C-alpha cells in the first residue's frame, strides 16, 4: 500500500518532460559504424575486440560479420546487459559463449561476476570498438559498460574507438543530476536523468571531465546528425523497448519501476502501459495480465489482473511535443 501511495504521489509531482518536436527524418543519418573509411585504418595490423550487441548493425549486416568479412583480426566480443543477442532479462546473468558464425569468443560483462573484463580478456586485443545503440537515459546501462571497458583499456594501454549512434531522446534534457554518493550500476555519472548525449559524447565528456581514466580515445561521429534530428531506431535496443513509442515514454514511465506498479513487462506493451490490481475499476478501465515473455521471464505482478492506463495509442508526435 505504501508503494502504491508513493506511485500516486510521484504521478502528481512528476514534471512534464516535454521535448521540442525534432525536425527532419533519420533517412540521411550515417552511423559511425558505416563510416569504415574513418576507422578501418585504425584496425590494420592490430587485434580487435568489440563491445557490441544486437543493435550493432551496418545496414542489414552485423558489425561483427562486417569486420570478419573484411579480414579484420577479431579476437573478442564483449557483451553488455541483455547479452550479445539482446534477449536476456534486465540484469540477468548471461554466460560467456562463442559466436557461431565467426568462432570469436563472446565474453559476457553480465556473467554474475564483476561486470568488468578479466586481465586475460584485456590481453587478447589491442584496440576496442564500441558500437551499441543507447536511448539517452542515465539508468540505461550500455554507457556504463562502455565506461568500465574504457577504464580497463586505460589500465592496459589499449585504444578505444567509439562508433557513434544518434540518441533517440537527444533533443532535450530533463531531471536532476545524479548525486554521486548514489553512484551504482544504473547510474555512473553526474548527469541528468535524460542527458541528451550520444555514446561518443558521453565517452569524450567522461574523459574530459576526469570522470573516467584518460585513455587513447577516438570517436567516429554520425554524419548528418544533430540533436534536432528525429531518429527512429532500426533495431530494438533491449527486449522491453520494442517500439519507438516505448522509447519515448521510457524516460517518464521507468521512474515508477521501484513501486509496486506494473509497467507492462510481460505484455505486448512494455513501457506503454501501467497498472496494479488495486487501482480502482471505476477509474481505470484498461486491464492486462503480465505473463512470462522473452526478456521478462518473471515480470512484476505475474499472472495478476491489473487495472491501469494504456498509452500504446498515444501518438509519438504528441509525446515529443507535450511529454507525459
Question: Model-found features: residue ranges?
Answer:
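Glycine-rich, charge-decorated loop segments at or immediately adjacent to ligand/cofactor-binding or catalytic sites
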Residues: 86-91, 161-183
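Bacterial N-terminal signal peptides
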Residues: 7-15
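Conserved anion/nucleotide-ligand pocket segment
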Residues: 183-253
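Short internal beta-strands
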Residues: 75-82, 163
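Glycine/threonine-rich flexible loop motifs
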Residues: 134-146
Amino acid at each position: 500500500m505504501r508503494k502504491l501511495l508513493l506511485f500516486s504521489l510521484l504521478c502528481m509531482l512528476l514534471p512534464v518532460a516535454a521535448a521540442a518536436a525534432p525536425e527532419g527524418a533519420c533517412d540521411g543519418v550515417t552511423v559511425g559504424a558505416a563510416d569504415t573509411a574513418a576507422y578501418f585504418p585504425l584496425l590494420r595490423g592490430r587485434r580487435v575486440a568489440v563491445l557490441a550487441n544486437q543493435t550493432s548493425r551496418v545496414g542489414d549486416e552485423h558489425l561483427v560479420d562486417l569486420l570478419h568479412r573484411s579480414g579484420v583480426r577479431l579476437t573478442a566480443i564483449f557483451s553488455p546487459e541483455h547479452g550479445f543477442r539482446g534477449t536476456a532479462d534486465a540484469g540477468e546473468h548471461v554466460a560467456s559463449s562463442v559466436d557461431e558464425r565467426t568462432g570469436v569468443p563472446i565474453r559476457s560483462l553480465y556473467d554474475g561476476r564483476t561486470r568488468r573484463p578479466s586481465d586475460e580478456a584485456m590481453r587478447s586485443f589491442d584496440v576496442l570498438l564500441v558500437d551499441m545503440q543507447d536511448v539517452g537515459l542515465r539508468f540505461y546501462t550500455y554507457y556504463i559498460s562502455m565506461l568500465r571497458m574504457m577504464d580497463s583499456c586505460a589500465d592496459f594501454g589499449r585504444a578505444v574507438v567509439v562508433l557513434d549512434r544518434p540518441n533517440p531522446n537527444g533533443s532535450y534534457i530533463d531531471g536532476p543530476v545524479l548525486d554521486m554518493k548514489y553512484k551504482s550500476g544504473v547510474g555512473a555519472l553526474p548527469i541528468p536523468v535524460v542527458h541528451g548525449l550520444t555514446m561518443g559524447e558521453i565517452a569524450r565528456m567522461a574523459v574530459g571531465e576526469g570522470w573516467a581514466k584518460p585513455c587513447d580515445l577516438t570517436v567516429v561521429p554520425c554524419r548528418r546528425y544533430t540533436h534536432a534530428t528525429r531518429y527512429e531506431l532500426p533495431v530494438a535496443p533491449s527486449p522491453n523497448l520494442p517500439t519507438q513509442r516505448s522509447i519515448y515514454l521510457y524516460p517518464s514511465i521507468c521512474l515508477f519501476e521501484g513501486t509496486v506498479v506494473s509497467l507492462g513487462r510481460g505484455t505486448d506493451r512494455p513501457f506503454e502501459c501501467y497498472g496494479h490490481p488495486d487501482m480502482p475499476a471505476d477509474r481505470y478501465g484498461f486491464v492486462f495480465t503480465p505473463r512470462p515473455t522473452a526478456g521478462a521471464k518473471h515480470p512484476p505482478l505475474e499472472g495478476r489482473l491489473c487495472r491501469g492506463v494504456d498509452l500504446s495509442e498515444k501518438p509519438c508526435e504528441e509525446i515529443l511535443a507535450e511529454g507525459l
